[in-house]
C-alpha cells in the first residue's frame, strides 16, 4: 500500500493525541507539544538538546603533527575511514529531510528527526574541520565516496533502500528504511568510529578521536530514535511484521555485516595494531546482534564483544581521567544510554 506524504497545512484534521501514528496518520502539522503520545520522543528530544556541542570546542592543534608521523598504512586508513563517515552523514542529512520525515505523522517524532538532520549537518562540519586541520588530501578525501570503487560499492548498497523508498513509498518500504537507518546508525557508523579509537589508544590523533566521541554520542540518540519507532510500529501495525519481512530484514543485516567486514579489512589492510580481520568481523557481528535484539529479532551470530575497550573510549557517562588530556573531565551532561528509553 502506497503512503502519502503528510500535509504541511491541514486545518480540517480532527486527529486526537491518542489517534496519532508513526506514519499514515492525519496530523494538523501544528507542533502542540503540550500533548504528547510518544513520551520517549519527548525525552529523546530533550536529551538531544542537552547534547549540543560545536566542532570548534575540540582542539585539533596536535593532530596535524600526529598525522605527519602516521605510517603510510595508518594515513590510508584514516583517510578512508573519514571519507566513509563524510558520505554517510551527507546521505543521512538529505535522507531524513527529503525521504523519511515527510511520511512520519507524529509531531514529537518530527521534531527529533529535524534535530537529527541538524546533527548530521553538524557532523559534516566537524569532518571538514578534521580534514582541513590535518590532511593534505582534502579534495581526494571528499571525492573518495565515488572515486574509490570499494567505497562506492558499499555506498551503492547503503543508498539502495532509501532510493527504493523515494521511488515507491509503500508501508513496507518505509519500515525497511527504518531498519536500514538502524543499520546505518548502529553498524556502519560504529565500525568507522572504532578505527579512530584504535589510533587514539596508541596516543595518536587524539583530537580526531575526541571529535568522533561527540559524534558518536549523537549517533546513540539517532539509533534509539529509529529503534523506538520500529518498536512502536510493532504495536500499531503488527500486520507489517510478517515472517517474509523479518527474513528480509535479517538478510539486510547479514549483507551489512559482510560488506562492513570487507570494508574494515580494506581500511586496516591487515597492518593496524589491535584490529585484526577476525576482531573486525566479530565486532561487526556483535553490533548486528545487539541492534536486532533491541527490536525483538533473534540474534544471528551469538558472539561476545571482542573489543570492549572501545566502550571506555566512547563513554560520556562517567567522570574519569580524559584520555585526550591529563585532566579530569565530567561528561555527564546529556549522557544517554539504551536503558534510558
UniProtKB/Swiss-Prot annotation:
GO terms for biological process: deoxyribonucleotide biosynthetic process. It catalyses: a 2'-deoxyribonucleoside 5'-diphosphate + [thioredoxin]-disulfide + H2O = a ribonucleoside 5'-diphosphate + [thioredoxin]-dithiol. It comes from the Bacteria. GO terms for molecular function: metal ion binding; ribonucleoside-diphosphate reductase activity, thioredoxin disulfide as acceptor. It holds the Pfam family Ribonuc_red_sm. The keyword NAD does not apply. Keywords: Deoxyribonucleotide synthesis, Iron, Metal-binding, Oxidoreductase. Fe cation 1 binds at residues 89, 120, 123. Binds 2 iron ions per subunit. Its EC number is 1.17.4.1. The keyword Metal-binding applies. It is an enzyme of class 1 (oxidoreductase). PROSITE patterns: RIBORED_SMALL (PS00368). The active site is at 127. Fe cation 2 binds at residues 120, 185, 219, 222. Signal peptide: none annotated. Its cofactor is Fe cation. Tetramer of two alpha and two beta subunits. Provides the precursors necessary for DNA synthesis. Catalyzes the biosynthesis of deoxyribonucleotides from the corresponding ribonucleotides. Belongs to the ribonucleoside diphosphate reductase small chain family. NCBIfam families: PRK09614.1-3. This is Ribonucleoside-diphosphate reductase subunit beta. The gene is nrdB.
Amino acid at each position: 500500500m502506497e503512503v502519502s506524504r503528510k500535509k504541511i497545512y491541514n486545518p480540517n484534521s480532527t486527529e486526537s493525541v491518542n489517534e496519532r501514528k508513526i506514519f499514515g496518520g492525519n496530523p494538523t502539522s501544528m507542533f502542540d507539544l503540550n500533548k504528547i503520545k510518544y513520551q520517549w520522543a519527548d525525552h529523546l528530544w530533550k536529551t538531544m538538546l542537552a547534547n549540543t556541542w560545536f566542532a570548534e570546542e575540540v582542539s585539533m592543534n596536535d593532530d596535524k603533527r600526529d598525522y605527519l608521523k602516521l605510517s603510510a598504512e595508518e594515513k590510508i586508513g584514516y583517510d578512508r575511514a573519514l571519507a566513509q563517515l563524510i558520505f554517510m552523514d551527507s546521505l543521512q542529512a538529505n535522507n531524513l529531510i527529503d525521504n523519511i520525515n515527510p511520511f512520519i505523522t507524529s509531531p514529537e517524532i518530527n521534531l527529533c528527526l529535524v534535530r537529527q538532520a541538524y546533527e548530521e549537518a553538524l557532523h559534516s562540519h566537524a569532518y571538514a574541520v578534521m580534514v582541513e586541520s590535518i590532511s593534505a588530501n582534502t579534495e581526494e578525501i571528499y571525492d573518495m565516496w565515488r572515486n574509490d570503487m570499494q567505497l562506492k560499492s558499499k555506498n551503492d548498497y547503503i543508498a539502495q533502500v532509501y532510493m527504493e523508498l523515494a521511488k515507491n513509498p509503500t508501508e513496507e518500504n518505509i519500515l525497511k528504511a527504518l531498519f536500514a537507518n538502524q543499520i546505518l546508525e548502529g553498524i556502519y557508523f560504529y565500525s568507522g568510529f572504532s578505527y579512530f579509537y584504535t589510533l587514539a589508544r596508541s596516543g595518536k590523533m587524539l583530537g580526531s578521536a575526541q571529535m568522533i566521541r561527540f559524534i558518536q554520542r549523537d549517533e546513540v540518540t539517532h539509533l534509539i530514535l529509529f529503534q523506538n519507532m520500529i518498536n512502536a510500529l510493532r504495536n500499531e501495525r503488527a500486520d507489517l511484521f510478517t515472517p517474509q519481512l523479518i527474513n528480509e530484514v535479517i538478510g539486510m543485516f547479514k549483507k551489512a555485516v559482510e560488506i562492513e567486514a570487507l570494508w574494515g579489512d580494506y581500511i586496516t589492510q591487515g597492518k593496524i595494531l589491535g584490529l585484526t580481520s577476525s576482531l573486525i568481523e566479530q565486532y561487526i557481528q556483535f553490533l548486528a546482534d545487539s541492534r536486532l535484539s533491541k527490536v525483538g529479532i533473534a540474534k544471528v551470530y551469538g558472539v561476545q564483544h571482542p573489543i570492549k575497550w572501545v566502550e571506555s573510549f566512547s563513554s560520556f557517562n562517567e567522570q574519569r581521567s580524559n584520555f585526550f588530556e591529563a585532566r579530569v573531565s565530567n561528561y555527564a551532561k546529556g549522557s544517554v544510554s539504551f536503558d534510558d528509553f
